[in-house]
UniProtKB/Swiss-Prot annotation:
A cellular component term, taken from the record's GO annotations: mitochondrial membrane
Main location: mitochondrion
Designated name of the protein: NADH-ubiquinone oxidoreductase chain 4L
Membrane topology designation: Multi-pass membrane protein
One Pfam match: Oxidored_q2
Tree of life domain: Eukaryota
Organism expressing this protein natively: Myxine glutinosa
């Protein structure tokens, strides 16, 4: 596949992150889409270069993506239990 495809998918996920800010779940899905496109781009670019220093980079990126997904799930469950919804409007800094 062409690396331009993954760059375009990253930009689409970034625009989704900018425009769909009502629910926390939609924000986390856009972040996961961005992480997936970066992972695919890193995997393709490391296969093109064939350097030993770039081979573990997609695996490291995948590890960070899994950690991000776990943390986002914990945040979503915690917010749903405390606020009874996942709306971003219910989050303010003054409630802390």
């Amino acid at each position: 596949m062409n690396p331009t495809t993954f760059i375009i998918s990253f930009m689409i996920a970034l625009s989704g992150l900018a425009f769909y800010q009502t629910h926390l779940l939609s924000l986390f899905l856009c972040l996961e889409g961005m992480a997936l496109s970066v992972f695919c781009l890193m995997a393709i670019s490391s296969s093109y270069t064939l350097s030993l220093s770039t081979i573990p980079l997609p695996l490291i990126m995948l590890t960070f993506s899994v950690c991000e997904a776990g943390l986002s799930l914990v945040l979503l469950v915690t917010m749903t239990r405390t606020h009874q919804n996942d709306l971003m409007s219910s989050l303010t800094l003054l409630k802390c």
